[in-house]
């Protein structure tokens, strides 16, 4: 794998700071993670945190991470976490369960979190968590590849009344903005000729147009 350092992200953002916002990433199982956090936030000016628990090998609800959550909450740094499936055989799925973030959000209610990929295939857990906690959201990145699954996931969102907790995302460069938009907007077409309930077009468009930056405290 090609390593990408926080300094690389900061340099990239500096080329177009009026439209780009950089997130730092760290491994809280390593002894120098506090230094990385401080450097990325205070020295490089990165404004959020991206975590990959299944690759670093930690449970998000481990009490040893309380220092990280406390810092992110105090400095209003939104945290984006991978939740759900992975194709890496040695990455424990148990570290990606959305329900693990329930304990974190309960302990740190002002912490803003985004559960990436709607936690698929654990969408039910994800919906339960974002419904319960005011500042916990989910994104729909990298889901349009499986339109039937995505339809059912968003129908779950619709029935639980949590459309307002969803954020648009793409997982670029693995997919593009245009492909992601087309995939979302075409979901109801697979239902033609059936009596299955439709996803609300208005709710879908509202999600696409949502001011995510304000919700996450980034503007």
Describe the residue ranges of each PLM region:
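Histidine/acidic-residue-rich catalytic or RNA/ligand-binding cores of hydrolases
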Residues: 91-98, 123-132, 148-155, 175-188
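Active-site neighborhood of phospho(di)ester-bond hydrolases with catalytic His/Asp-centered motifs
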Residues: 23-24, 50, 113-116, 139-141, ...
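Mid-to-C-terminal alpha-helical segments outside catalytic/metal-binding sites
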Residues: 39, 160-167, 179-219
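A generic "structured core" feature
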Residues: 104-107, 113, 175
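His/Asp/Glu-enriched short active-site or ligand-binding loop at hydrolase and phosphoryl-transfer sites
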Residues: 136-147
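Alpha-helical scaffolding within the catalytic cores
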Residues: 5-10, 33-36, 98-101, 122-125, ...
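Active-site environment of divalent metal-dependent phosphoester hydrolases
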Residues: 28-32, 56, 85-89, 119-127, ...
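Active-site gating/metal-coordination segments in enzymes
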Residues: 3-95, 136
């Amino acid at each position: 794998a090609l390593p990408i350092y926080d300094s690389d992200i900061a340099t990239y953002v500096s080329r177009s700071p009026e439209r780009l916002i950089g997130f730092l990433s760290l491994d809280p199982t390593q002894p120098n993670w506090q230094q990385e956090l401080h450097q990325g936030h205070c020295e490089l000016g990165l404004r959020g945190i991206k975590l990959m628990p299944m690759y670093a090998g930690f449970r998000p609800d481990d009490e040893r991470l309380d220092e990280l959550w406390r810092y992110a909450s105090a400095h209003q740094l939104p945290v984006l976490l991978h939740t759900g499936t992975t194709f890496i055989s040695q990455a424990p799925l148990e570290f990606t369960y959305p329900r693990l973030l329930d304990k974190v959000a309960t302990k740190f209610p002002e912490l803003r979190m985004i559960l990436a990929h709607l936690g698929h295939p654990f969408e039910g857990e994800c919906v339960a968590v974002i419904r319960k906690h005011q500042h916990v959201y989910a994104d729909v990145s990298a889901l349009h590849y499986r339109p039937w699954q995505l339809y059912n996931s968003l129908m779950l969102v619709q029935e639980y009344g949590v459309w307002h907790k969803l954020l648009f995302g793409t997982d670029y460069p693995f997919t593009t903005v245009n492909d992601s938009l087309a995939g979302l907007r075409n979901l109801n077409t697979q239902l033609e000729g059936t009596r299955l309930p439709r996803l609300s077009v208005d709710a879908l468009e509202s999600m696409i147009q949502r001011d995510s930056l304000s919700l996450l405290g980034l503007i």
